[in-house]
Amino acid sequence: MQAEKLAYYPFTSEASAYVGNLGISLESLLNSRAYRAARARGIERVKEALEGEIKKSPVSGEAQVLSELLSYPFARMLVACVDDQLFTRRYALAEAKAAYTFLRNENPDFLLEFGDDFGISADSQDSYFSMHFTDYIRFSNSLKDPSWKLTNRQLRAGKIKITKEEFSRLLEEAVRERIEQSFPVPEIPPEVSSFCSPYAAEIKDKFEVQKKKFGSTDFGAVKPELFPPCIAYALANVQGGVNLAHSMRFAMTSFLLNVGMSVDEILNLFNISPDFNAEKTLYQIEHIAGATGNTYKPPACDTMRTYGNCVGKDRLCEKISHPLGYYEKKVFIKNKEGEEAQGKEQGKEKDDGKEKENGKESEVKKKKEK
């Protein structure tokens, strides 16, 4: 690959080797004025990932190519310092999506070479690609559109036939997986932590604001902090841009509908998911909500366990057989605690009132005695 091309795909083995051969020290990347543009671009791509989209424009010229290439390792340092699993997922997803915008326009030979870097053995013929079904399953597993199911594909001699665009989409998943699995970084050098600290703090603060907005505004009167662990886990994954398994997606959606969230509110939760399709998602939510005449309750705990969706079990879970029962119990406990606190406050106000009244009576009595 030429250097200009490597700048679009800085997570490849070839790009990593190219940067390594430049012989640029960590100290230089962090402090040298020569790489100021690379640092600025690295900060920019992490901030853009926070918003959901890393914008990449065509690069030309040695200086621009170098800045784009070096911005990736600097961005990785920054993400490592943020040290938040959800944010790491969001960053990996944004990088993969940005790569896909270029991958879908590449020629078949380039895509085959690119796939080989990720251990994907494939062939192309007559604008179609074929890949081994094990690779297909590995990278299509997180894609929830029914068209990706193996049962909806032609399997011949262990190979799956797909279009160029579909192959590019699977390569996007390979990119996302590689980046996501490269975190957390085992040991961050002290000089990196020191340099990245102010930028990491800013990104953390912005991400926390996003999470709080997600947790309060979007839910209205619903109390997400009282959700059972399984639903809280599903929401955290959605927020991190992770596609849920169909069974967990149904469980979460039906739960949220039953606790009072609207169809539009739930739709907004999914708009960060990979392959988000507003029309299809809306249809699925409305179907669960009862648009066809059948309303659905979320699965019971036994069913959640059967499908591997029982996550983070706590003490209350031991006494509960249904996610809705968990939420109702939590709401009851919280309301009771609120009533008790209010009762104590009212009792304190009465005691204060009595003390004031007794004080007034004492003053009057003293005046009379005088």
From Swiss-Prot:
Cofactor requirements of the protein: [4Fe-4S] cluster
Entry GO MF terms: 4 iron, 4 sulfur cluster binding; DNA-directed RNA polymerase activity; metal ion binding
Domain of life the protein comes from: Archaea
Disordered: region residues: 337-370
Entry's Gene Ontology BP terms: DNA replication initiation; DNA replication, synthesis of primer
Residues that, per the record, bind [4Fe-4S] cluster: 230, 301, 310, 317
Cofactor binding, note field: Binds 1 [4Fe-4S] cluster.
Disulfide bonds: none
InterPro entries: DNA_primase_lsu_euk/arc, DNA_primase_lsu_PriL
Iron as UniProt keyword: yes
Cited function: Regulatory subunit of DNA primase, an RNA polymerase that catalyzes the synthesis of short RNA molecules used as primers for DNA polymerase during DNA replication. Stabilizes and modulates the activity of the small subunit, increasing the rate of DNA synthesis, and conferring RNA synthesis capability. The DNA polymerase activity may enable DNA primase to also catalyze primer extension after primer synthesis. May also play a role in DNA repair.
Family to which the UniProt record says this protein belongs: Belongs to the eukaryotic-type primase large subunit family.
HAMAP family assigned to the protein according to its UniProt record, in alphabetical order: DNA_primase_lrg_arc
Subunit structure: Heterodimer of a small subunit (PriS) and a large subunit (PriL).
Annotated protein name in UniProt: DNA primase large subunit PriL
